[in-house]
């Protein structure tokens, strides 16, 4: 049984379209997960460099419903399946598919999306295990190679870019957004010793939490506060996710010299009377650092392949655990029914105890089979047990 075969990934990245397009496609994906995610396990990753949807056990019709969200970019999207879909996710988490090879930001973004979608009930079952293992692979790559030495991500690159234009130690700086990218920006700017640091976020409590750690000032992310920052700050970094421009004008008398737009889609309007640095401006700098990391990338790829090779057995074990749990749950339901039918208060407890004593030895054997590498055989046994529904209700026959 190939438990990776039901996995499919629909992929659109910075290699095919620009960041602004990715942002708008990402919004379509959000609608899709709200519709399809309640039916099938699904994981959507939306960053400034990619929009990807991973589905498990989805029909062709359901996969097509996802690709329709990309219909204007039909020639650019890729649909990969099975082990290749898993390999791609592992490589993404490891930073091997990023504009800046080895960036750490992407791993934080994968974790953030994963936590959010698990809580929402969208990423579950074996797909949950696949994403967990991808995150594990990404962490192992960072721990065992030097692929992430230097800039952590595009946010770090943007700081390097700006530092070549002015002295950050003499600059007042604002960061709009306190997500994974915004928090990383704020931390690095504080470490560089900017003259004054402001952190703005829609949820003020999160901005306060980060600001307190960094000696910064927290403000709510409102139009008024953004305009105030333009009046007070030399540099403003925007890492906000918004369908509307967060900065659409620069007020008279503003002192801001540089605005960095890391938002997807773009959060800074074109044509402003100030220098605006966008993701496309960082490409050359990203290529420079990526070239320096290529030797470490080879080691990272070896780790990814090693972790990927473990995945089929891990999924088979997880499949058994889920199946046995389902089997035990159903058996307990029957036991309770039989106990209640007996009309004795202790009968329910006795019935449940009997089920446990009967099934637990079988469960232990299945676990031992899994530990001994006989996962395929264990899966077959579970399938046989699950198909014998009449055995669970002999008293009704």
Swiss-Prot record:
GO molecular function, one term: glutamyl-tRNA reductase activity
UniProt pathway annotation: Porphyrin-containing compound metabolism; protoporphyrin-IX biosynthesis; 5-aminolevulinate from L-glutamyl-tRNA(Glu): step 1/2
Active site: 48 (nucleophile)
Domain notes from UniProt: Possesses an unusual extended V-shaped dimeric structure with each monomer consisting of three distinct domains arranged along a curved 'spinal' alpha-helix. The N-terminal catalytic domain specifically recognizes the glutamate moiety of the substrate. The second domain is the NADPH-binding domain, and the third C-terminal domain is responsible for dimerization.
PANTHER family in the record: GLUTAMYL-TRNA REDUCTASE (PTHR43013:SF1)
Further information: During catalysis, the active site Cys acts as a nucleophile attacking the alpha-carbonyl group of tRNA-bound glutamate with the formation of a thioester intermediate between enzyme and glutamate, and the concomitant release of tRNA(Glu). The thioester intermediate is finally reduced by direct hydride transfer from NADPH, to form the product GSA.
Protein name in the entry: Glutamyl-tRNA reductase
Origin species: Pyrobaculum aerophilum (strain ATCC 51768 / DSM 7523 / JCM 9630 / CIP 104966 / NBRC 100827 / IM2)
Taxon lineage: Archaea, Thermoproteota, Thermoprotei, Thermoproteales, Thermoproteaceae
Gene: hemA
């Amino acid at each position: 049984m190939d438990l990776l075969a039901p996995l499919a990934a629909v992929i659109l990245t910075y290699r095919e379209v620009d960041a602004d397009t990715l942002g708008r496609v990402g919004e379509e994906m959000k609608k899709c997960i709200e519709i399809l995610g309640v039916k099938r396990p699904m994981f959507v990753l939306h960053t400034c460099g990619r929009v990807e949807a991973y589905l498990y056990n989805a029909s062709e019709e359901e996969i097509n419903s996802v690709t329709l969200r990309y219909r204007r970019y039909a020639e650019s999207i890729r649909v990969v399946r099975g082990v290749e879909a898993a390999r791609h996710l592992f490589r993404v988490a490891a930073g091997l598919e990023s504009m800046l090879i080895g960036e750490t930001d992407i791993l934080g973004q994968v974790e953030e999306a994963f936590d959010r979608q698990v809580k929402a009930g969208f990423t579950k079952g074996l797909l949950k295990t696949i994403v967990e293992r991808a995150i594990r692979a990404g962490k192992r790559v960072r721990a065992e190679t030097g692929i992430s030495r230097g800039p952590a991500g595009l946010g770090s690159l943007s700081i390097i870019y700006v530092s070549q234009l002015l002295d950050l130690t003499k600059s007042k700086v604002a960061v709009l957004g306190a997500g994974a990218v915004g928090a990383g920006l704020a931390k690095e700017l504080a470490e560089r010793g900017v003259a004054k640091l402001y952190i703005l976020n829609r949820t003020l409590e999160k901005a306060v939490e980060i600001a307190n750690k960094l000696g910064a000032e927290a403000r709510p992310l409102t139009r008024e506060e953004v305009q105030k920052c333009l009046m007070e700050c030399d540099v403003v970094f925007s890492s906000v996710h918004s369908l509307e421009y967060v900065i659409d004008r620069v007020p008279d008398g503003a002192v801001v010299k540089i605005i960095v737009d890391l938002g997807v889609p773009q959060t800074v309007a074109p044509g402003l009377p100030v220098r605006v640095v966008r993701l496309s401006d960082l490409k050359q700098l990203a290529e420079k650092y990526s070239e320096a990391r290529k030797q470490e990338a080879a080691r990272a790829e070896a780790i990814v392949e090693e972790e990927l090779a473990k995945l089929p057995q891990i999924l088979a074990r997880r499949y058994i655990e889920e199946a046995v749990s389902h089997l035990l749950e159903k058996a307990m339901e029957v036991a309770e029914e039989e106990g209640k039918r007996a009309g004795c208060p202790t009968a329910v407890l006795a019935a449940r105890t009997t089920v446990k004593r009967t099934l637990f030895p079988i469960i232990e054997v299945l676990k031992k089979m899994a530990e001994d590498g006989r996962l395929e055989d264990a899966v077959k046994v579970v399938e046989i047990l699950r198909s014998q529904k009449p055995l669970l209700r002999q008293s009704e026959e």
